[in-house]
């Protein structure tokens, strides 16, 4: 079974095509409706650690109900969560991050609209901490801190269903994300996927992340096109899911093909 963390403000609904392709290739999938996301109440305050705990709880539940062995996967922010999970858990067979970065990296700010002030990163975080204490629920839409143009650059046909997706994040959550530190040692084979034309998670950022990871084995796999949202495209989703299933089989996961 594969535990899947959705990306920024998304839930499993937006990844239905990719998750269905994984299922068709024989993988059972446990896709997470994280705290404050998807079918859960959106008004609740939450932190990065709360979202990570959702995945750790899912792992424990799945093992308790005989659903092992398990894999980890996540896209974008979900890729960061998958990396954090793989650094905490000793029982995962492999981790597949579809874009990811260490938030504590000095270059992580390059993902955001605050890149011109990279030299002031510590002061920005200190200011953000004060603001998040005073206004923890202040809603910030994605375009307030990320470039939507970069997110959408290079995307192919995208049948995106916005149901149950968030429209903003509370300021307190964003501070918890930007200030968290994710351990670079993961306890299972690690696969980092990224599109060559991703304008958000650029090649230099991905290469730096990959170099920093310590794992029993690690592989960086470049998707030829599709931009940051590549795995939401039906064509890329089908090919990537088949690749993931083949790798999963090599790590001892039984596949149940649905023809």
Give, region by region, the residue ranges found by the protein language model.
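Catalytic nucleophile-loop/oxyanion-hole region of alpha/beta-hydrolase
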Residues: 9-11, 38-66
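Serine-hydrolase catalytic-loop signature spanning alpha/beta hydrolases and amidase-signature enzymes
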Residues: 9-17, 29
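Catalytic histidine-centered segment of alpha/beta-hydrolase-like enzymes
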Residues: 226-236
């Amino acid at each position: 079974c594969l535990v899947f963390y959705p990306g920024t403000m998304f839930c499993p609904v937006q990844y239905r095509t990719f998750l269905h392709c994984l299922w068709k290739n024989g993988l059972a999938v446990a896709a997470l409706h994280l705290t404050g996301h998807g079918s859960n109440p959106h008004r609740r305050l939450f932190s990065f650690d709360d979202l990570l705990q959702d995945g750790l709880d899912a792992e424990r539940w799945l093992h308790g109900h005989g659903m092992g062995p398990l894999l980890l996967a996540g896209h974008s922010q979900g890729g960061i969560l998958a990396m954090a999970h793989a650094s905490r858990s000793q029982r995962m067979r492999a981790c597949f991050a579809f874009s990811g970065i260490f938030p504590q990296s000095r270059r992580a700010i390059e993902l955001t609209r605050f890149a011109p002030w990279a030299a002031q990163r510590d002061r920005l975080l200190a200011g953000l901490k004060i603001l998040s204490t005073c206004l923890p629920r202040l809603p910030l839409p994605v375009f307030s801190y990320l470039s939507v143009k970069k997110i959408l650059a290079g995307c192919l046909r995208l049948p995106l269903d916005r149901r149950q997706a968030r429209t903003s994040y509370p300021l307190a959550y964003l501070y918890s994300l930007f200030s968290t530190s994710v351990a670079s040692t993961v306890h299972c084979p690690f696969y980092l996927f990224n599109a060559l034309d991703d304008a958000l998670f650029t090649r230099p950022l991905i290469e730096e992340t990959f170099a920093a990871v310590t794992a029993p084995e690690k592989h960086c796999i470049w998707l030829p096109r599709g931009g940051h949202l590549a795995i939401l495209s039906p064509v890329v989703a089908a090919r990537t899911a088949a690749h993931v299933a083949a790798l999963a089989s090599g790590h001892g996961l039984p596949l149940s093909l649905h023809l």
